[in-house]
């Protein structure tokens, strides 16, 4: 298995989340529906965020040689989340930070303060001792439209590449290779669980 985000073990119905899904909007509808199933056990916002992080891990790992993304060696951060949800290596061979942000409003824009992106770059620089670079090297993946102009150009100074709703749609909508990649990972996980249960009998 290549996907390691804990959501793969915590989701309410991982198979149901991806079965016959072909578009980003279909995935979002199912994720939002599942998020309301057991809110006392798994808070809605937490479920949406974790599900989106899992999706983004799949997106990144299924496009390592595609220079539109070009992130390799990606590892999700599952503890001490202070603004960075994962690290990888970008197309320039540099360590890069990744921040997925799920938003139900696909027309909205992310801002550094409202959407808690203030610590993103700072945390990346400190945690991995990343040196400043002339080219963009960090990534935000969001179901919102994108970054607010001020956040993009003044706060991040063009060093963060944001994949918004429309850009992600162009990568995954009706892309059966991508959706089958995720379903294959889900199937492997389910087979592993069944195997472990069988060994305990």
Model-identified regions with their sequence ranges:
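Charged, structured surface patches that assemble and position nucleic-acid processing machinery
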Residues: 151-193
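Hydrophobic/aromatic beta-strand patches that form the interior of the parallel beta-sheet core
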Residues: 98, 139-141, 161-163
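Surface-exposed polar/charged interaction patches
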Residues: 34-37, 123, 127, 174, ...
């Amino acid at each position: 298995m290549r996907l390691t985000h804990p959501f793969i073990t915590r989701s309410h119905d991982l198979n149901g989340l991806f079965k016959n899904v072909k578009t980003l909007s279909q995935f979002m509808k199912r994720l939002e529906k599942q998020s309301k199933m057991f809110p006392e056990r798994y808070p809605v916002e937490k479920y949406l965020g974790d599900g989106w992080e899992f999706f983004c891990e799949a997106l990144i790992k299924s496009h390592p040689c595609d220079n539109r993304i070009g992130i390799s060696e990606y590892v999700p951060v599952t503890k001490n989340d202070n603004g960075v949800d994962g690290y990888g290596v970008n197309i320039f061979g540099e360590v890069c930070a990744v921040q997925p942000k799920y938003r139900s409003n696909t027309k909205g824009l992310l801002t550094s303060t409202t959407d808690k992106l203030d610590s993103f770059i700072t945390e990346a620089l400190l945690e991995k001792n990343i040196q400043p670079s002339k080219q963009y090297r960090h990534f935000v993946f969001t179901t919102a439209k994108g970054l607010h102009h001020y956040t993009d150009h003044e706060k991040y100074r063009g060093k963060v590449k944001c994949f918004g709703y429309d850009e992600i749609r162009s990568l995954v909508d009706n892309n059966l290779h991508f959706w089958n990649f995720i379903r294959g990972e889900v199937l492997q996980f389910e087979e592993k669980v069944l195997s472990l249960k069988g060994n305990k009998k």
